[in-house]
Amino acid sequence: MSCYNKALLIGNKVVVILVFLLCLVHSSESLRPLFACDPANGLTRTLRFCRANVPIHVRVQDLLGRLTLQEKIRNLVNNAAAVPRLGIGGYEWWSEALHGISDVGPGAKFGGAFPGATSFPQVITTAASFNQSLWEEIGRVVSDEARAMYNGGVAGLTYWSPNVNILRDPRWGRGQETPGEDPIVAAKYAASYVRGLQGTAAGNRLKVAACCKHYTAYDLDNWNGVDRFHFNAKVTQQDLEDTYNVPFKSCVYEGKVASVMCSYNQVNGKPTCADENLLKNTIRGQWRLNGYIVSDCDSVDVFFNQQHYTSTPEEAAARSIKAGLDLDCGPFLAIFTEGAVKKGLLTENDINLALANTLTVQMRLGMFDGNLGPYANLGPRDVCTPAHKHLALEAAHQGIVLLKNSARSLPLSPRRHRTVAVIGPNSDVTETMIGNYAGKACAYTSPLQGISRYARTLHQAGCAGVACKGNQGFGAAEAAAREADATVLVMGLDQSIEAETRDRTGLLLPGYQQDLVTRVAQASRGPVILVLMSGGPIDVTFAKNDPRVAAIIWAGYPGQAGGAAIANIIFGAANPGGKLPMTWYPQDYVAKVPMTVMAMRASGNYPGRTYRFYKGPVVFPFGFGLSYTTFTHSLAKSPLAQLSVSLSNLNSANTILNSSSHSIKVSHTNCNSFPKMPLHVEVSNTGEFDGTHTVFVFAEPPINGIKGLGVNKQLIAFEKVHVMAGAKQTVQVDVDACKHLGVVDEYGKRRIPMGEHKLHIGDLKHTILVQPQL
């Protein structure tokens, strides 16, 4: 959000002037030297907070003791002020690295020695790879480039990424930024990407500081007159525990993330950035966050000025800080916190607690060590390297999903398909491929450019832009299809259709796109391949059922190398192995389900959400994706058929014996003592192509009286495996009763149902009898 927009939100002439002054200070200080405690500075080199060999918590307290109240307050906001008398420069906390270094936030700038950075596929596309090691490796590369740019003075070290909200509704404009609809996938993605970004340095040190956002139940931007600034998400404890909060908990527990961002919306009547239970009690208390909590930009201003949650701005400042907020993206706390102290709404100690969390992260990053630290050797030569570009291409290969391939029409042959018509509004795009929250890419390969490496191309856009408001270009597109040996239609969406602040109203292709596909398919003398670029699902039932459309590919937003990856898959240089990370619903789904309804489970005429709870027809299901080869599954070893759950005490046993739900609370069990049940899944490649395959393990719980359970099945594990043609690979998944077989009851408590649990691995089914050990 720009400084101008921030000023508009405050709504007071005096404050507007202050805001612009703060913005001017930010703009002049953002490229100051990015570390304090320069050993050449005789004023600071002897200060205790500058001694890298002193424990960080001691250094933080020493620095806090030297700051005035006003200096502390000016460091509660993203454009933190300099403290020249202590040799501390200003710092911009807000940088973005969703799928590469971005210049969306003010913390990173491109130009000079750093004209761009590697732009990987949008997250929804990378998620479709279901490859945890790939996710972590992308994070590692992004952090290399971040450190290089930091060393060059054009970027910071605090990145407000990843976005791990659940893709609850297919219309959400920001669904493209997320790992999809499944909370376990989002949780694994969150932990993997955060580990890649932050590194694994000894001594609790950080390479860069990641931030998981937007906590919590945020997945509506602007729909049917309801926007994120005014939306109150009414969410049950059950849905919070088993859906919305799962990725954030994993971010903190498994990923050890350095920051969590609270969201604009309210949850059950409270702004998330002023909710002590969500912030102080849950993130910092239960989950033990080792880091800071930051607001989404201007969230504190939003809950005062737009949600009218408090009577005065000083009360808003106090409520947010006392709830556990440490840093405000925006000027609000810099302006109103001192007044809150004077009115007795806050103490200086409250401010110290918040500031200690941000200073600790900066010290873990080495920003007070007086030098650039262990990554000082990284520079311009380490950005956009050949290896990084290759990883961007490989990520696109792994994430692109083959949805239809009638009569094995793909791959095309360069010998037989020498002329290819390349048609559609997305056929020669570049920036569209990198989605939102992107930076300046190293270089682009559009679909047209990629296909041109394999065949002579006849190019026609067909319509002007994805809105496709007219059919004037259809005739030329049909003529090209008649002449070519094969036709590739590159259709779909872009940021004008789905984006932050822009939710969709329907799921169909925009404008005349469907008509263009149908007419070109009728005219084409060769096979027709439909390629879709989008973040959210599209109802393409017409193409799925049209025999003249031989193949359908979903490319998501495939990144800077997207065109090369699409072409490689079409011509068989790469074998598609992606799987859909979200359900593709039919158009009539949106007529039944308002975006404002947060309930996950089906009830009455309400069909539920995501594959876990939705009961209805789909265009393509979650986890669907074809390959040029075929795979079969078998169980290499006979798994256990029974698991016994031991109880932690006699009272718990009595509870279970008298329970009508036939389940045990996870909190009443000895989870650490349970034997894990290994599943050895043998994956055989029975086709002619080498390929990658995702092994999904779903659990279907017994129906045994747990009220409001309503789950069809839930993913408990997934593994990516590469198998050569004619070969086999064995994948081991260890099933943990507490972790994998538990469900959440209507009160938000995790329970293990007793009875027969069904595990689904492809076409395989295995039943486990779970019973109490009394």
UniProtKB/Swiss-Prot annotation:
Tell me what the record says about temperature and activity: Optimum temperature is 55 degrees Celsius.
Induction note: By sugar starvation.
What Enzyme Commission number(s) appear in the record?
A: 3.2.1.-, 3.2.1.55
Could you list this entry's UniProt keywords, alphabetically sorted. Extracellular matrix, Glycoprotein, Glycosidase, Hydrolase, Secreted, Signal
Give the signal peptide range: 1-30
What's known about how pH impacts activity here? Optimum pH is 4.9.
Q: Which residues are glycosylated?
A: N131, N658
- Name the GO terms of the biological process aspect: seed coat development; xylan catabolic process
**Entry's Gene3D superfamilies?**
Glycoside hydrolase family 3 C-terminal domain (3.40.50.1700), Glycoside hydrolase, family 3, N-terminal domain (3.20.20.300), Immunoglobulins (2.60.40.10)
According to its UniProt record, which residues of this chain constitute the active site? D296
Which subcellular locations apply to this protein?
Answer: Secreted, Extracellular space, Extracellular matrix
Q: Which InterPro entries match?
A: BXL, Fn3-like, Glyco_hydro_3_C, Glyco_hydro_3_C_sf, Glyco_hydro_3_N, Glyco_hydro_3_N_sf, Glycoside_hydrolase_SF, Ig-like_fold
- One GO cellular component term, please give it: apoplast
Mutant phenotype after disruption: Delayed seeds germination resulting from an altered mucilage composition. No visible growth defects; probably due to partial redundancy with BXL2. Bxl1 and bxl2 double mutants have shortened siliques and curled leaf edges.
Q: Which GO terms describe its molecular function?
A: alpha-L-arabinofuranosidase activity; xylan 1,4-beta-xylosidase activity
The record, for SUPFAM superfamilies, names: (Trans)glycosidases, Beta-D-glucan exohydrolase, C-terminal domain
User: So what does this thing catalyse?
Assistant: Hydrolysis of terminal non-reducing alpha-L-arabinofuranoside residues in alpha-L-arabinosides
The UniProt entry's coiled-coil ranges are none
Give a brief account of the tissues where this protein occurs: Expressed in leaves, stems, seedlings, roots, inflorescences, siliques and developing seeds. Expressed in the vasculature of the roots, leaves, flowers and silique. Expressed in tissues undergoing secondary cell wall thickening such as protoxylem, metaxylem, intrafascicular cambium and fibers.
Note the PANTHER family from the entry: BETA-D-XYLOSIDASE 1, SUGAR HYDROLASE-RELATED
Say which family it is in.
Belongs to the glycosyl hydrolase 3 family.
More about this protein: Might be processed at the C-terminus.
Summarizing the function annotation, the protein's role is: Involved in pectic arabinan modification in mucilage secretory cells. Also acts as a beta-D-xylosidase during the remodeling of xylans in vascular development.
Q: What is this protein called?
A: Beta-D-xylosidase 1
